[in-house]
Amino acid sequence: MSHNMKGQKIRLAKAHKQNTRVPVWVIVKTNRKVVSHPRRRHWRRRSLDVK
């Protein structure tokens, strides 16, 4: 495995971690004003710009 692939794997892992829903405690704390995650990504609809 080259160094390039390792960097790409790290970036993919970061994108995977970022792609989570809003925590329940945030929804409760904000009294449902914050429900959706504006940067949420679906694997089929939006592609990643990973280099």
Curated annotation (Swiss-Prot):
Molecular function per GO: structural constituent of ribosome
PROSITE patterns, alphabetized: RIBOSOMAL_L39E (PS00051)
A GO BP entry: translation
Any one annotated GO CC term: ribosome
Keyword annotations: Ribonucleoprotein, Ribosomal protein
NCBIfam families: PRK01242.1
Protein name in UniProt: Large ribosomal subunit protein eL39
